Amino acid sequence: MAAGLWALLLPLAAAVYEDQVGKFDWRQQYVGKLKFASLEAAQGSKKLLVGTEKNVVAALNSRSGEILWRHADKATPEGAIDAMLIHGQDAITVSSAGRILRSWETNIGGLNWETSLDTGSFQTASLVGLQDAVKYVAVLKKAAISLHYLSNGHQKWVEHLPESENTQYQMLYSRGAGVIHVLGVVPQSHLKVLTLSVEDGEVIEQTKVAAPWLKSLNGACGVVGEAVLVCADTATHSLYVCSLETEQEMKQIPLQSLDLEFADGFQPRVLATQPSVINASRTQFFLQLSPGHFSLLQCKQGLLSHLRDFQQAALVSFATTGEKTVAAVLTCRNELKPASSDGLHGNALEDSQKQEALTCSNQTYNINLYLVETGQRLLDTTITFNLEQNGAKPEQLYIQVFLKKDDSVGYRALVQTEDHMLMFLQQPGKVVWSREESLAEVVSLEMVDLPLTGAQAELEGEFGKKADGLLGMFLKRLSSQLILLQAWTAHLWKMFYDARKPRSQIKNEINIDNLARDEFNLQKMMVMVTASGKLFGIESSSGTILWKQYLRNVRPGASLKLMVQRTTAHFPHPPQCTLLVKDKETKMSFLYVFNPIFGKRSQVAPPVLKRPVLQTLLLPIMDQDYAKVLLLIDDEYKVTAFPATKNVLRQLEEMAHSIFFYLVDAEQGKLSGFRLKKDLTTEESWQVAIPTEVQRIVTVKGKRSSEHVHSQGRVMGDRSVLYKSLNPNLLAVVTESTDTHHERTFVGIYLIDGVTGRIIHSSVQKKAKGPVHIVHSENWVVYQYWNTKARRNEFTVLELYEGTEQYNATAFSSLDRPLLPQVLQQSYIFPSAISAMEATITERGITSRHLLIGLPSGAILSLPKALLDPRRPEIPTEQSREENLIPYSPDVQIHAERFINYNQTVSQIRGIYTSPSGLESTCLVVAYGLDIYQTRVYPSKQFDVLKDDYDYVLISSVLFGLVFATMITKRLAQVKLLNRAWR
């Protein structure tokens, strides 16, 4: 029977293709910036449980940093993780603004249970225990508190909180005594303490404590010891202490009595710890007096005592193992100094005030452990580690403590820096692993060609220069060939040397010193800019990070635009990239110029931008060093050129009449066109107003400047040519209705000439809404939207044609276009939502175009543009068959064989970047979101290179056989002719 079953299943088996094992593609998975983390308190533990700002719950391998399991929620505020609690093998999360409560099994990441919570503003959540067991989880909302069973999530009871309109309930506290304390505050009036029974939720006691100085409990207050509330007040420079169970008034303790003082303008924080929810909190707590000043205090029997002062501390943390609780303090190895006002923020402070951050001059840090009972430092517990110079400083600290065999304390530390890098450290300072989690939020990406090798550059140097005479050129060619021979010999020796080793021991390490362009230009440098302000140089064929650079003066939410001013084609001039950083709050901008191959800052000094930048233009004009000219237009419509040499200014003056640009003001609903004057001032040439009370501008999409169009028209069935309308200045403007009612919503699209402001075409999709994804290329526009009437996703494609006669075949000018192009339009039904969309691009534009569509499932669909052709006929004719037009069908099917990433899904995909390679058949693709995925696609198959499975042995054998047969046949023919001649 087993043999029969095996024979039955055998035909269903399928082999994995070679490109599915990472030969031409790779994927890197991330979790994002940490929001919550829990490290198992055992020496042999292997898991780190994390909840991140990217709405991810995951477990990391503490020995390698690899992701053991991961669950990513929606990439919207609805999927945000509000709280994360750990108990044994269960991880409890509250998400979706307090609407969903989940329990995860931490070993394999399985979902134990999920329950929906009542609506209401989420405040906090806490585990609740009885005697010696944790049985419940409590969730506090603005107006109610609910208790749920830890085993199945079922609600035990819910209690509405009194006076919730005026009282801000913000804290929960329970210590296994059968009651839950709910703490609320009426700002600048009093503190309210509710004591509820765990069994039925009945309010046992209500207490009001006068606190006219108290505005909020979050951060400024903490519960220590046997339910004692400790709060800090900057106005009176005091600490206030109140027992939640026995006292009804706050006891004031001036800081002067402890020889302490708050920093001016700093909001202090109280950091308490409760190792177990069935026991009381520790009586010891940290009081943060300034960004770099912490004090370890103890509150015992109503008395405050000062245990130890840490005046140069960057981060602190508590950790418990068994009966021992320790405090970890991260300090600079040398003296800390105040940082300049560069937009950096302190250690996860939630206050809105801008504080002085502390930075370490040599980027060398120490972590030490201290006994919380005495403040005494534990010997042999120092971890020393280094961060990159001019890099980010530590932002969060998590400690994993365990007891060694000799009952001494050992620990590991997880440090997260401002640039979202995770480092896992062990004594005495070994970096076990690190993760660059800022790559989970890539905002800008460019691919740059790698430089030539020395031999290739030597050969290139023979061309384009004045002749050195016949002998000189011969000697130069001879030396170049000798260099190539030497490189080839070294390559053969390496192949022979590696062939003698096991495959697992062969190292093909890629480093920044041996980077060189390959034969088909498939290997490139990927320059990625992340939201944290960190730049990466990644080798495209393997995903190896070759360099990274952190910009300290980039604020969160800043707009980042990356431009390539000079490529590697202009040897010996180094390539040059420019990053425009625009602050979200101040609107001020600055330029950062760097070498994309090595990541080093360029010696070229960019201009100082004194006004907010509205628009940038990368012109085809070059300076004497072959750097493209970048024009920056500020809010006063003044133009700044970079570089601004005399040669550049002269070229700008000559070409000013042909330089146009546009500005978009979405708030006012205006599109304005400007032209450049010879004196580098601007003049408004056109304006299009879109009424903001009816619709709003959501997207303005132009064409890629690097795009090449090979075919100027399409040959129709009657052998005539339908010429494309290839307007490089065409803008596609997408609008959405401001009315959100599903019967009145609409999506509009306007095709506007960016030089003249002429509206080429406009159309409206009624009963439709966004989000709208659009691709604008060649003579076509494809955009996707949601049809509210039919409740489905739809594509609409527009194609522009001049007709059967071309108006001006030599040069295009927007100023000389008397006739509007013909616009063909057709819509299609798509069975899935879309996360991102982009078109393939090749070096010459000969290859067929495909649309790369990122789906919410993480798959990337390669859809031939021929399926979205507005000329597809409903009833096929002889001419349409001659053109190979597919008959029109409104449904666009998703076939699994069109997924370019097979099972390598990209979570929370946000964008797709395409780049041409040296092969016309090949397009390089990078999809980024929570993960990064790189691959190659062949829209028209590989027609210009032999496939990897090409049988060289067979074809060589056939050729040798034919040559041998030819020689024998020739000899036999000669003998035959000779014999015939003798007859």
Swiss-Prot record:
Residues 974-983 are cytoplasmic. It comes from the Eukaryota. Keywords: Disulfide bond, Endoplasmic reticulum, Glycoprotein, Membrane, Signal, Transmembrane, Transmembrane helix. The keyword Transferase does not apply. Residues 1-16 form the signal peptide. Glycans are attached at N279, N362, N808, N903. One of its GO terms (cellular component) is endoplasmic reticulum membrane. It is a single-pass type I membrane protein. Residues 17-952 are lumenal. It is found in: Endoplasmic reticulum membrane. InterPro entries: EMC1, EMC1_C, Quinoprotein_ADH-like_sf, WD40/YVTN_repeat-like_dom_sf. The chain crosses the membrane at residues 953-973. Its main location: endoplasmic reticulum. Pfam families: Beta-prop_EMC1_N, EMC1_C. GO terms for biological process: protein insertion into ER membrane by stop-transfer membrane-anchor sequence; tail-anchored membrane protein insertion into ER membrane. Disulfide bonds join C221-C231, C332-C360. Part of the endoplasmic reticulum membrane protein complex (EMC) that enables the energy-independent insertion into endoplasmic reticulum membranes of newly synthesized membrane proteins. Preferentially accommodates proteins with transmembrane domains that are weakly hydrophobic or contain destabilizing features such as charged and aromatic residues. Involved in the cotranslational insertion of multi-pass membrane proteins in which stop-transfer membrane-anchor sequences become ER membrane spanning helices. Component of the ER membrane protein complex (EMC). Belongs to the EMC1 family. This is ER membrane protein complex subunit 1.
